[in-house]
Curated annotation (Swiss-Prot):
Name of protein: Large ribosomal subunit protein uL2
One Gene Ontology biological process: cytoplasmic translation
Name of encoding gene: rplB
Example of a GO MF term: rRNA binding
Pfam family, one: Ribosomal_L2
Biased composition (Basic residues): 269-279
Basic and acidic residues biased stretches: 253-268
């Protein structure tokens, strides 16, 4: 993938860029793997906003991705196409298995049309193959990693993501995550070899607010710019600083909100470099 820059023909295009989509081999998705994806505008069943800054955007259909890859062990598959997926930053690969079934997977870097891949404990160590962690050599770069055996991939799924298998210790495998955290994961969990493709995606300059609206992202408004009815920092004559310590729209103090002493904390060998202090 490469980044194509626009000429500054308008203020919105000045400095903006777009992916060149050179790796895409088909523009229409596989119909049998499409599902409806209705929009909710960040609202729950009561109509209340539960996730802010969501709304509008282009209509999408969900592509069913095989995150488990545990029911086709030993069955060879051919990469039929590399496709665009509007629901994620990574590209997806359409696999044609020799038994006639079709599946989508996250497309790893350097995977191309016509490649042969497979799953299972005896699979080769090459990009796109899926194996249990206990069967992967130490030092291998992996992605699409399960947290529970058979639970489906949860980590390392976005564009350019890569996790390194640094050690194996009894029933656990130690992984170094992109954040710098080192974490134990059950060695029976599966992972895919290689790093996720489309790594240049993070370098795209969207150029104007309208392109984010096409993606379904609404503006983020500062609390001090609101009215008192809308935010604890709202109101005041002229420009004010809010008059209190930073809080959320619901009065929660600024800072980390994750509960400490979670059961999964014992699996963390070394924490990532924290940007904000715990409160």
């Amino acid at each position: 993938m490469a980044i194509r820059k626009y000429k500054p023909t308008t203020p919105g295009r000045r400095g903006s860029s777009v992916a060149d989509f050179a790796e895409i081999t088909r523009s229409t998705p596989e119909k049998s793997l499409l599902r409806p994806l209705p929009k909710h505008g960040g609202r729950n069943n009561a109509g209340r906003i539960t996730t802010r800054h969501i709304g509008g955007g282009h209509k999408r259909q969900y592509r069913v991705i095989d995150f488990k890859r545990n029911d086709k062990d030993g069955v060879l598959a051919t990469v039929a196409h590399i496709e665009y997926d509007p629901n994620r930053t990574a590209r997806i690969a359409l696999l044609h298995f020799i038994d006639g079934t079709k599946r989508y997977i996250i497309a790893p870097n350097k995977l191309k049309q016509g490649d042969k891949i497979e799953s299972g404990a005896q699979a080769d160590i090459k990009p796109g193959n899926n194996l249990p962690l206990r069967n992967i050599p130490t030092g291998t770069v992996i992605h699409a990693i399960e947290l529970r055996p058979g639970g489906g991939a949860k980590m390392g799924r976005s564009a350019g993501a890569s996790v390194r298998l640094v050690a194996k210790d009894g029933p656990y495998a130690q992984l170094r995550l992109p954040s710098g955290e080192i974490r134990n994961v059950d060695a029976r969990c599966r992972a895919t070899i290689g790093e996720v493709g489309n790594a240049e995606q993070s370098n795209i300059n969207w150029g104007k607010a309208g392109r984010m609206r096409w993606k379904g992202v609404r503006p983020t408004v500062r609390g001090v710019a609101m009215n008192p009815v809308d935010h604890p920092h709202g109101g005041g004559e002229g420009k004010t600083s809010g008059g209190r310590h930073p809080v959320s729209p619901w009065g929660q103090k600024e800072g980390r909100t994750r509960h400490i002493n979670k059961p999964s904390d014992k699996l963390i060998v070394r924490r990532r470099n924290a940007g904000k202090k715990r409160k």
